[in-house]
Regions:
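N-terminal first-folded block
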Residues: 18-67
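Flexible, charged surface loops at secondary-structure boundaries
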Residues: 11-14, 61-63, 117
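C-terminal structural segments of small proteins and small subunits
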Residues: 86-128
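Small/polar loops that bind or transfer phosphate-bearing groups
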Residues: 21-22, 70-71, 93
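Intrinsically disordered, low-complexity and often Lys/Arg-enriched segments
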Residues: 1-17, 128
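Glycine-rich loop at the start of a catalytic domain that most often binds anionic cofactors/ligands
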Residues: 80-85
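Nucleotide phosphate-binding site architecture
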Residues: 76
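Residues at secondary-structure transition points
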Residues: 48-56, 73, 96-100
Length: 128
């Protein structure tokens, strides 16, 4: 069963969670998450940010107040150093098939979304 972990600092949030799916994750993951979990999700390509560097993506996320779904620890480091927003949904299950990724997210994302809605700046979902 996937583990869901969070940081110790919370930030207030008064709106629904909007997810941006990082470029190293499958682009179709955005539609899958949106359909399965009834949450707004977009991949970076659809947002015109596929070739942007992490600092540019972080700045755009900060302006929008959205959540990045990423395997990239750089976003975790930036939020830890600079503070939220954005929030980070950090997927640490390694390189897995889409099927395994869907299984991990199906088990961990409901609790992860609740933590994000309650202001957790960093939520980790792993396949363990």
């Amino acid at each position: 069963m996937p583990a869901v972990c969070c940081s110790s600092h919370r930030v207030p949030t008064g709106r629904g969670v909007k997810l941006w799916i990082d470029a190293q994750l499958p682009p179709a993951l955005a539609a899958w998450i949106a359909d399965r979990f009834d949450v707004e999700a977009s991949n970076l390509d659809a947002l015109g940010l596929r070739h942007a560097d992490d600092a540019q993506i972080f700045a755009a996320l900060r302006d929008a107040g959205n959540v990045i779904v990423s395997k990239d620890e750089d976003f975790v480091d930036m939020v830890t150093r600079l503070g939220p927003p954005p929030q980070v949904l950090w997927v640490t299950c390694g390189n897995v098939t889409n099927r395994v990724l869907h299984t991990v997210l199906s088990a961990g994302l409901p609790n992860g979304l609740e933590l994000l809605k309650h202001g957790e700046p960093i939520v980790e979902i792993s396949g363990e």
